[in-house]
Amino acid sequence: VLELTMAAVSAADEGATAGMLMADAPSEAGAVLRVGRDKSVCRLATPDDWLFVSRVHLEFLCGPDGGWQVTWLRGSQADPSSEVRMTVGEYVQPIAYGGTVPLPRGGSGEIVVQDRTAPRSVNVGFYHEG
């Protein structure tokens, strides 16, 4: 099982957990969870006017071995208006635009989509059961 929690954080309400969304999916090959502005395909939807987030920004996909990975999907712009990084414990790893990284089995962490032009972010916490 992969469990996700998402909070949209702006400078005005930093530290607030109001509006936190949650989603989970079984660790079965082909299972998908998406994060973005498009509510029709994203289980975790961000505010419509947060244009630094793509319609479908992050895709969590379960592979045939039950391991999960996250991909920062390329949007309609050549240069993204956000930065994405994954934190696991003390380790911080930037995720490249269009890049994919595996999630640690039996581990937890956070993926942050940071607006490049304003002090706001989308924080997605994850827990991947081993």
Where are these regions (language model features)?
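Intrinsically disordered, low-complexity acidic Ser/Thr-rich regulatory segments
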Residues: V1-W50, L61, T100-G130
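Short coil-to-beta strand junction motifs in C2/discoidin
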Residues: F52-R55
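Forkhead-associated
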Residues: H57-Q114
